């Protein structure tokens, strides 16, 4: 149980790190969660992130799972985009986000 909770928290933190690009006029890119578990259940996550009132960042992710391996694509407002990937094991999925954005 502890390992499951730790893995979930890790996934949340990893995907949230990409959101820092939403700061000061960057788009808010987010990658979708990877597959959830060995069955590759598709998991998507909608995220709202804003670190600046004048230039809020936001994005959404779509997850696609297959055989425990999943990929996610995300697009963020104000020119940001991201890619997420994950490997599901022991009924859990870990996701990472990579984001790029442009200044307005």
UniProtKB/Swiss-Prot annotation:
Keyword annotations: Secreted, Signal
Cellular compartments annotated: Secreted
Gene Ontology cellular-component terms listed: extracellular region
Signal peptide: 1-18
Tissue specificity note: Expressed by the venom gland.
Family: Belongs to the non-disulfide-bridged peptide (NDBP) superfamily.
Name of the protein this chain belongs to: Glycine-rich protein
């Amino acid at each position: 149980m502890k390992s499951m909770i730790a893995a979930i928290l890790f996934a949340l933190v990893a995907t949230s790190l990409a959101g820092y690009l939403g700061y000061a006029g960057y788009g808010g890119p987010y990658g979708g969660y990877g597959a959830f578990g060995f069955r590759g259940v598709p998991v998507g996550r909608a995220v709202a992130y804003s670190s600046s009132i004048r230039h809020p960042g936001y994005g959404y992710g779509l997850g696609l799972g297959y055989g425990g391996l999943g990929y996610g694509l995300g697009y963020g407002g104000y020119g940001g985009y991201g890619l997420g990937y994950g490997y599901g094991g022991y009924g859990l999925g870990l996701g990472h986000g990579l984001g790029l954005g442009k200044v307005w």
